[in-house]
UniProtKB/Swiss-Prot annotation:
<keyword id="KW-0677">Repeat</keyword>
<keyword id="KW-0325">Glycoprotein</keyword>
<feature type="glycosylation site" description="N-linked (GlcNAc...) asparagine">
    <location>
        <position position="614"/>
    </location>
</feature>
<feature type="domain" description="LysM 5">
    <location>
        <begin position="617"/>
        <end position="663"/>
    </location>
</feature>
<feature type="glycosylation site" description="N-linked (GlcNAc...) asparagine">
    <location>
        <position position="43"/>
    </location>
</feature>
<dbReference type="Pfam" id="PF01476">
    <property type="entry name" value="LysM"/>
</dbReference>
<feature type="domain" description="LysM 1">
    <location>
        <begin position="166"/>
        <end position="211"/>
    </location>
</feature>
<keyword id="KW-0843">Virulence</keyword>
<feature type="domain" description="LysM 2">
    <location>
        <begin position="216"/>
        <end position="264"/>
    </location>
</feature>
<dbReference type="InterPro" id="IPR018392">
    <property type="entry name" value="LysM_dom"/>
</dbReference>
<feature type="glycosylation site" description="N-linked (GlcNAc...) asparagine">
    <location>
        <position position="153"/>
    </location>
</feature>
<feature type="region of interest" description="Disordered">
    <location>
        <begin position="585"/>
        <end position="610"/>
    </location>
</feature>
<feature type="glycosylation site" description="N-linked (GlcNAc...) asparagine">
    <location>
        <position position="398"/>
    </location>
</feature>
<comment type="function">
    <text>Might have a role in sequestration of chitin oligosaccharides (breakdown products of fungal cell walls that are released during invasion and act as triggers of host immunity) to dampen host defense.</text>
</comment>
<keyword id="KW-0147">Chitin-binding</keyword>
<comment type="similarity">
    <text>Belongs to the secreted LysM effector family.</text>
</comment>
<feature type="glycosylation site" description="N-linked (GlcNAc...) asparagine">
    <location>
        <position position="531"/>
    </location>
</feature>
């Protein structure tokens, strides 16, 4: 499914939208000097219109994004259009010709005239529109003088061409993540330097890539966070952000890059986080400020960059060898979420001399200890405050995983939001979901899109998870089936684009159904065994872009007896709104403990292999237990639990239900 865009004609109602209230978007109409009746009418909430309309009308001053099919289905409803037309008619009848919106005591024609007479505000198209509108309104007294163009004898530095220290030729089986891992470079560097797109969709066999500098790597998993990564790497959050410029200053977008390899140590970066200048490249004088420079950028600048279509702040910083933090400092008018870059305008991308000498530059001061009578040691600390999602009422606050429901407009949303399905893919039971989320109802248990729920407490227990539903998706339109799929397929699943394609392969998928890639290709002849993964995800750009594929022509494979062994792997997603098979991690589940387990007289139940002989305290594994839950319950550390139970793996995927583990010596 290809990305879809909204035609400009879709904004024909923009004037109406801006004069009323969409849920979640508010405007102080009472401050505009309008009549009481007009204000009351304008203050009407149109509940039938989606918040997507407010976002696309730019009511939140954010970025207008490209929409995909589910967004369009939510946006383009007959009820919304009818209600907007009705409100427009009511506004026209309630608000008189004296109800003129005068913001900040400036009449609109007058402010427009002043703008057109300024060399900084004049534009031929705006001038034509102004003349046309004042003429149609029979407004007089607004004749303007075309200003003399304001010019400098300089132009902005053209977009730089990346200098490649190394190159790489793409193979048929490559992904952005595999290239990054093999060459010891960050995934984002590979993606941004070569304009491959967030989902790596522009990666083509035979293409020559420019590789970024090497560094020590770590792959982001769904269980990571910035604090844990910097602790493990013995570094700091400012350094981590400096080495990985796609991370925002608060590091709150860390989990947007699950599956990416990031730098946790980089020799070519200074400890403070700024890009270390290559010898001889430190600028000592500023270049002339270009005529198209952003007004709020530093004028004491050694290099300017003109924003091109598709650019983002992180892309610009990587291409110009500057950290994202420094880019924001040199261009203070840019929002920290980079939603207000102006196309065709120039931004400063290189300081003059040492950027730390600029007034107002935030300098990181090392931790300091000093003594004064009486002796007192003070140590500076670094605090990271991350935004928190809205949790369901009463939901446990110590869970290891949270999730929310899919949008109602999605195919099979009711099934995929059901507690039985959520429990199944997370390796827990419905009873546990109800226990961890008291707001959920046993009779109609389903996750809401607006709230986050606890879906896992520690690691899942190694036991089969009952699920009486089906993995088969309900296809609404046969046109969604890829041509060439076998005609007798009676069970479909689907995959999504975006980050999902970075860590999902055909091998991951078939491992769930106990057959090989060859059989998957037989079910879907439009795939080939040699390029199965690439063909499965072809043209899937974003996380809301998905494709159906056949997983069985003999019924739901979930309810068929496994042919090869008792062990089955259920792949899970970090958030429920991703496609069913989009796998950053997996939970291994077994039907029973191995028959070789032994029992002793002391423990209250059979023990797992590897328990120490001097154990004095035991815990019998119950449904819902995981390593985190066990060592937290007994006030011990994870290291102690693994030391006393040497055969338990670090990911706790092999503890056995009903067996005793040592929790004290």
């Amino acid at each position: 499914m290809l990305w879809l865009t909204v035609s400009l004609t879709g904004f024909a109602l923009l004037g109406v939208v801006a004069a009323q209230q969409i849920e979640g978007f508010y405007y102080p109409y009472h401050l505009l000097g309008l009549s009481d009746g007009c204000v009351e009418t304008l203050n009407t909430t149109i509940s039938s219109c989606s918040q997507v309309l407010g976002q696309q009308a730019n009511l939140d001053s954010g970025a207008v994004r490209v929409l995909v099919a589910p967004d369009l289905n939510e946006l383009c409803t007959t009820a919304c259009v009818d209600d907007l037309k009705s409100l427009k008619t009511k506004i026209q009848s309630t608000c008189s010709k004296d109800d003129v919106m005068v913001k900040n005591d400036i009449a609109y024609p007058g402010s427009w005239k002043a703008q057109l007479e300024s060399p900084f505000g004049y534009d031929d198209s705006l001038a034509s529109d102004f003349s046309s509108q004042t003429s149609s309104c029979h407004a007089t007294g607004f004749t303007f003088t075309t200003p003399t163009a304001y010019a400098l004898n300089t132009t902005a530095t053209p977009a730089p061409t990346p200098i490649c220290q190394r190159t790489y030729t793409v193979l048929a089986t490559d992904t952005c993540a595999s290239i990054a891992q093999a060459n010891k470079v960050a995934t984002f560097g590979v993606v941004s330097l070569n304009n491959l797109g967030t989902g790596c969709e522009a990666l083509v066999e035979g293409k020559t890539l420019c590789l970024p500098e090497t560094c020590t790597l770590r792959k982001i998993t769904r269980d990571d966070d910035c604090g844990q990564v910097v602790k493990d790497a013995n570094t700091t959050i400012p350094r981590l952000i400096a080495w990985n410029p796609m991370l925002n200053p608060e590091c709150s977008n860390f989990l947007d890059y699950i599956g990416y390899y990031i730098c946790i140590s980089c020799l070519l970066r200074t400890p403070g986080g700024s890009a270390k200048p290559i010898e001889g490249e430190t600028a000592i004088t500023a270049v002339p400020v270009p005529t198209n420079a952003n007004a709020e950028s530093q004028k004491n600048c050694a290099k300017w960059y003109v924003v091109q279509p598709g650019d983002g702040c992180a892309d610009i910083s990587v291409a110009n060898g500057i950290t994202l933090v420094d880019f924001y400092f040199l261009n203070s008018g840019v929002n920290r979420d980079c939603t207000n870059l102006w196309l065709g305008y120039a931004y400063c991308v290189k300081p003059v001399g040492n950027i730390q000498t600029y007034p107002g530059y935030p300098v990181t001061v090392p931790s300091t200890s000093f003594t004064r009578p009486p002796a007192l040691t003070e140590t500076s600390t670094e605090t990271l405050v991350l935004p928190t999602p809205t949790y369901a009422p009463g939901t446990y606050d110590n869970c290891s995983d949270y999730s929310r429901g899919m949008p109602a407009s999605w195919s099979d949303a009711a099934k995929l939001n059901s507690c039985s399905f959520i429990a199944h893919i997370n390796g827990v039971t419905v009873s546990q979901l109800l226990q961890w989320n008291p707001s959920l109802s046993k009779d109609s248990c389903s996750l809401s899109r607006e709230l986050y729920y606890c879906v896992r407490m520690g690691q899942p227990v190694s036991e089969p998870i009952d699920y009486d539903g089906t993995l088969c998706m309900n296809i609404q339109d046969d046109k969604d089936i890829v041509p060439g799929t076998i005609s007798n397929c009676n069970c479909f699943s689907y995959v999504s684009g975006g980050l999902g394609k970075l860590y999902t392969t055909c091998e991951d998928i078939v491992s769930e159904f106990d057959y090989d890639v060859g059989h998957l290709v037989e079910l879907n002849p439009w795939l080939t065994k040699a390029n199965c993964t690439k063909e499965l995800f072809a043209d899937l750009s974003g996380p809301y872009d998905y494709r159906y594929f056949c997983i069985s022509n003999t019924g739901d494979p979930l309810h068929q007896s496994p042919a090869k062994s008792q062990t089955r792997t259920i792949h899970t997603t970090s958030t429920v709104q991703r496609a069913v098979i989009s796998t950053p991690s997996s939970v291994s589940m077994t039907n029973s403990a191995p028959a070789t387990a032994t029992s002793t007289g002391g423990p209250p139940a059979p023990t797992q292999d590897g328990a120490v002989s001097n154990c004095t305290k035991w815990h019998v594994v119950e449904s819902g237990d995981g390593c985190w839950a066990i060592y937290t319950k007994y006030g011990i550390t994870s290291d102690q639990l693994f030391e006393w139970n040497t055969k338990i793996s670090k990911d706790c995927s092999n503890i056995w239900l009903g067996y005793a583990v040592c929790v004290g010596v």
